Regions:
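Bacterial N-terminal signal peptides that target proteins for export
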Residues: 3-13
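Intrinsic disorder/low-complexity segments, especially N-terminal tails and targeting/processing regions
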Residues: 7, 21-22, 26
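Charged, low-complexity surface segments at secondary-structure and domain boundaries
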Residues: 1-2, 46
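A "functional boundary" signal
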Residues: 11-12, 25-279
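Bacterial N-terminal signal peptides
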Residues: 13-22
Length: 279
């Protein structure tokens, strides 16, 4: 990525963080809010340090990749580690490294790796608005041939694609069609997930919220939050979703608190797929 694009992303990132900071500051009045706004302010000031930390990890992984034999499984694994670093940081780079892994798996006949990587790429592309590309990858996937452990990935990718399509289409007929497909794949997903899994709990929470039961959704979020370690992507996601539940409940103070916690985590981890900052 060129310097100007990176600078623009950093500017947008910091601008949105300041907006969140100001919103939280307006809601402040307790010592906990004061401490939180101070932490957010410090993180905004230090954002370039956090970016440098992530870039350092990526650089070290790329050095490992250079030393790997392209015919060896280690090449696939190092590519996968680089993809994970880019996933919530720079989407087009994440797509590139997943595509490299998909090509590698196809070239060397690693069918399990082909299927797993294809589904991961389909989900990522659907998240990035590359709907036709995601749909094509899913069309290339024969559900009947999938091992059972990949069925959740398949249904989750399909659910993601049709949820995104239903949200962005301007045609009411297509919206209803996509919503029906999203519901179908969500039902299928819930049937193959372990009830104790993080994705199962996330989907249950979303269902309760969509059904107009924010208190029940918040109870599920309590469980998720208890298991989410601070300063992790999971914590950023759970706190953001918690802020949305408090909004539904009309609790603006708690909404802003958890929105700020999510934004703070995003900044510290250099997560630029920052839903909390766009809210």
């Amino acid at each position: 990525m060129n310097f100007m694009v990176m600078e623009r992303r950093l500017f947008t990132f910091c601008f949105l963080a300041v907006v969140v900071w100001q919103s939280v500051a307006l809601a402040a009045g307790t010592s906990s809010f004061t401490a939180l706004t101070a932490s957010l302010d410090e993180a905004i000031e230090a954002h370039r340090h956090y970016v440098a930390v992530r870039e350092g990890r990526i650089a070290r992984l790329k050095c490992q990749l250079l030393d790997a034999d392209t015919a060896n499984l280690s090449f696939f694994r190092w590519n996968g580690e680089i993809y994970k670093e880019y996933k919530t940081y720079i989407c087009d780079s994440a797509i590139h490294y997943l595509r490299v892994n998909l090509d590698w798996a196809e070239r060397y006949g690693r069918q399990d790796a082909v299927l797993e990587t294809r589904l991961e790429l389909a989900h990522l592309m659907a998240s990035a608005g590359m709907y036709e590309e995601a749909a094509e990858l899913l069309r290339q996937t024969d559900k009947a041939s999938l091992p059972s452990h990949l069925l959740p990935d398949y249904y989750n990718a399909c659910h993601k694609l049709y949820t995104e399509l239903s949200f962005y289409t301007l045609d009411d007929s297509f919206k209803k069609h996509y919503q029906a497909l999203a519901t179908h794949y969500d039902d299928s997903l819930m049937q193959v997930l372990l009830p104790s899994s993080s994705l199962y709990l996330e989907r249950r929470e979303a269902r309760e919220a969509a059904a107009g039961h924010p208190d029940e959704a918040l109870s599920i979020n309590d469980t998720r939050l208890a298991h989410a370690k601070p300063n992790t992507p999971e914590y950023a996601l759970v706190t953001y979703q918690r802020s949305l539940l408090y909004r539904r409940l009309g609790n603006r103070e708690e909404e802003k608190r958890y929105l700020a916690l999510s934004a703070l985590t995003d900044i510290r981890l250099s997560i630029t797929d920052h839903a909390s900052l766009w809210n």
